[in-house]
């Protein structure tokens, strides 16, 4: 049933609460507010009792799909279940009542948590130093690329180009362009991995760095990474790893050991904080030893004084790229990530990645006979199918398949990305899904494959059972209208 707008529930004179009479003379609010701040006409606010407000938003929440409701297989997004203990620790009063401008000596517990989180992340990725400031993955990319530019500038090397592998995470070219680099794309080979010969052809004295994602966005590990690392470093360039797919690597291998100079993490993805709907996110950046001087300020430092430790915020870094935020990053996400890592421990962190890989390969084995796999298996934590067969034989597009999944109770995978896969369906089940849930999702995908062959119009006209049927997404993007009636 379609849910009405809160404004349509409004009836003149209805109130949520009535306040009991007071013993003191009431003052009209307009007498307490300077005239320059007063509205010239009343706000058009809905008049709805509290019970109806609560029911309205509960009904709306039930229309949403989220990871607490069912599987959310959005490729390259790591929509894992987030343990509720993470939220409980993030809500501790000592963390929620602090202010970023208060003296460091009065926030020692907060600084200790941030320092220890940085040390754990540094160890997981095998890097020399870290900043927690960036507010999201793409913000981490921007931070890393600014450090790349500062590194080359400090060596009087005015490099103008940045290479991005075509299977890398989608925000990489945009982040590099923001810093002013010319972007060159490095092709993938027939295996879906970086084409070494194309890389060699594009490496020259003007290349500042190579950006790639490992595993890449079709779920394949770059098995030639040591050769890639050697080529890049022999050219005087830096090697950047997008950590979007770090969920496949934890405790198994480390970017620093592969030779990466910079890596950014996504705490909201790999380290289990709720994300989607605009955040908050957190995109810490780890660097090798030679890039430590360029890290954003302030830097948290630990000082051991006998039996106690104290933590300070240091800004005396003359080669630093400066601040990336007004303050120190999205702290509530850091608390959740810290809780997650401490709860799992080293063995648990490795088990997360092992189970993510097992789940992806298990699900792929259930679907591979009915959907095309453009590149060879095995995969890591995610895989990318193609809907080419369905489109060519039955005129059913990947978009149709994704919409039909909504009818069957699942969120759709990432579609039409990466661009190197035609009619792409990128699926990441994560480690937190049970075998039974994976089987249910596989059954839904196989049902859609059957419908594509026997009644393609069922898939082409999906969704039929959602509160809103198929939207004209192109028109919605071009002619955005977010105003309620009467606004």
From Swiss-Prot:
Coiled coil: none annotated. One of its GO terms (cellular component) is glycine cleavage complex. The keyword Cytoplasm does not apply. It catalyses: N(6)-[(R)-lipoyl]-L-lysyl-[glycine-cleavage complex H protein] + glycine + H(+) = N(6)-[(R)-S(8)-aminomethyldihydrolipoyl]-L-lysyl-[glycine-cleavage complex H protein] + CO2. It comes from the Bacteria. Its cofactor is pyridoxal 5'-phosphate. One of its GO terms (biological process) is glycine decarboxylation via glycine cleavage system. Its EC number is 1.4.4.2. Keywords: Oxidoreductase, Pyridoxal phosphate. Transmembrane segments: none annotated. The modification N6-(pyridoxal phosphate)lysine is found at residue 269. SUPFAM superfamilies: PLP-dependent transferases. GO terms for molecular function: glycine binding; glycine dehydrogenase (decarboxylating) activity; pyridoxal phosphate binding. The glycine cleavage system catalyzes the degradation of glycine. The P protein binds the alpha-amino group of glycine through its pyridoxal phosphate cofactor; CO(2) is released and the remaining methylamine moiety is then transferred to the lipoamide cofactor of the H protein. Belongs to the GcvP family. C-terminal subunit subfamily. The glycine cleavage system is composed of four proteins: P, T, L and H. In this organism, the P 'protein' is a heterodimer of two subunits. This is Probable glycine dehydrogenase (decarboxylating) subunit 2. It comes from Prosthecochloris aestuarii (strain DSM 271 / SK 413).
């Amino acid at each position: 049933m379609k849910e009405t707008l809160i404004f349509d529930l409004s009836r003149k004179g209805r109130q949520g609460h009535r306040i009991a009479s007071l013993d003191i003379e009431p003052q009209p609010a307009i007498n307490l507010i300077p005239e320059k701040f007063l509205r010239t006409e009343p706000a058009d606010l809905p008049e709805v009792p509290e019970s109806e407000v609560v029911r309205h938003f509960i009904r709306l929440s039930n229309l949403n799909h989220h990871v607490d409701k069912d599987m959310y297989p959005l490729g390259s997004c790591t929509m894992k279940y987030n343990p509720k203990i993470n939220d409980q620790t993030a809500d501790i009063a000592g963390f929620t009542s602090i202010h970023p401008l208060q003296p460091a000596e009065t926030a020692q517990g907060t600084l200790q948590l941030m320092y220890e989180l940085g040390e754990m992340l540094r160890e997981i990725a095998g890097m020399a130093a870290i900043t927690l400031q960036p507010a999201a993955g793409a913000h981490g990319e921007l931070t890393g690329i600014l450090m790349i530019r500062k590194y080359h500038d400090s060596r009087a090397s005015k490099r103008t180009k940045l290479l991005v592998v075509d299977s890398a995470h989608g925000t990489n070219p945009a982040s590099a362009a923001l810093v002013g680099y010319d972007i060159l794309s490095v092709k993938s080979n027939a295996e879906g991995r970086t084409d070494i010969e194309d890389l060699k052809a594009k490496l020259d004295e003007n290349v500042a760095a190579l950006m790639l994602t490992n595993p890449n966005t079709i779920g394949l590990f770059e098995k030639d990474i040591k050769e890639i690392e050697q080529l890049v470093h022999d050219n005087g360039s830096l090697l950047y790893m997008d950590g979007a797919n770090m969920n496949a690597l934890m405790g198994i291998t480390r970017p620093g050991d592969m030779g990466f100079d910079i890596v950014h993490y996504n705490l909201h993805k790999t380290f289990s904080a709720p994300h989607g709907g605009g955040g908050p996110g957190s995109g810490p950046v780890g660097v090798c030893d030679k890039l430590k001087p360029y890290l954003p300020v302030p830097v948290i430092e630990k000082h051991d004084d006998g039996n106690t430790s104290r933590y300070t915020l240091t800004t005396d870094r003359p080669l630093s790229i400066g601040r990336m935020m007004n303050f120190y990053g999205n702290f509530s996400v850091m608390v959740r990530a810290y809780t997650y890592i401490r709860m799992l421990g080293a063995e648990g962190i490795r088990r997360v990645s092992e189970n993510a890989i097992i789940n992806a390969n298990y699900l792929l084995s259930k679907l591979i006979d009915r959907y095309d796999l453009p590149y060879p298996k095995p995969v890591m934590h995610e895989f990318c199918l193609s809907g080419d067969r369905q489109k060519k034989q039955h005129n059913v597009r990947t978009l149709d398949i994704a919409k039909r999944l909504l009818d069957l109770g699942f969120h759709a995978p990432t579609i039409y990305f990466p661009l190197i896969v035609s009619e792409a369906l990128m699926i990441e089940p994560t480690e937190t899904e049970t075998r039974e849930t994976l089987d249910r999702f596989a059954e839904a995908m196989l049902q859609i494959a059957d419908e594509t062959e026997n009644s393609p119009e069922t898939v082409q006209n999906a969704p039929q059972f959602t509160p809103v049927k198929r939207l004209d997404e192109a028109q919605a993007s071009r002619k955005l209208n977010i105003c309620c009636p009467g606004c």
